[in-house]
Amino acid sequence: KETSDQDMIRTFCNPPKKSATNESVIVIDAGGTNFRSCLVTFDAAGAATISEMEKTRMPGVERELSRKEFFEQFAVNLEHLKNKADRIGFCFSYPMEIQKDGDGILLGFSKEVKAPEVVGCKVGECLKEALAAHGWNTIKRITMCNDTVSALLAGAACAGETHRYSSYIGYILGT
């Protein structure tokens, strides 16, 4: 087995076979310093509109958090999007083992985040539990992707139906 200085963790996140239409999805970007969230609404033609964008501090940066506190802060950060969609696309910028159901098991934190009890947890499942505790309607699906995969899929999606390329690259330079 070859070794590498880069984590190469497989993903089960593929581009959708067809563009979403007439629906909304909650989108989260949890990075090294910031936690961003918004609602993305697709019209009848599949064009996306971003609304209700908020940026807060990433939980666990200011002090060490327990697992419960970590996901509780996620739920608080998402309160402005409560019950506005039943699916979540989650760009989580930390190494995860992506599962076939779209969830991700956290392998470890990098950067400044301090929440050691979260390591080994299914991030999407824990988030669903925290949202339910805040009175959210049932979330049907949370799809986890790391930042590089998210960049790759976004680039492929932006190409649209009229521009197809032989390959795509997702590239994250610094944070």
Please identify what each model-predicted range represents.
Residues 36-38, 42-45, 51-62, 72-81:
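Extended mixed-charge, aromatic/glycine-enriched low-complexity segments
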Residues 25-26, 84-93, 142-143:
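Short glycine-rich phosphate-binding loop at a beta-alpha junction
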Residues 1-17, 145-146:
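Charged, flexible boundary elements
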Residues 30-31, 53-59, 90-95:
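Short loop/turn segments at strand-loop or loop-helix junctions that form parts
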Residues 55-72, 96-169:
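Glycine-rich phosphate-binding loop and adjoining helix at the ATP-binding site
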Residues 74-87, 130-136:
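Phosphate/pyrophosphate-binding loops at sites that engage ATP/ADP/AMP, CoA/4′-phosphopantetheine
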Residues 13-51, 98, 165-175:
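Gly/Thr-rich phosphate-binding beta-strand-loop-beta motif of the actin/hexokinase/Hsp70
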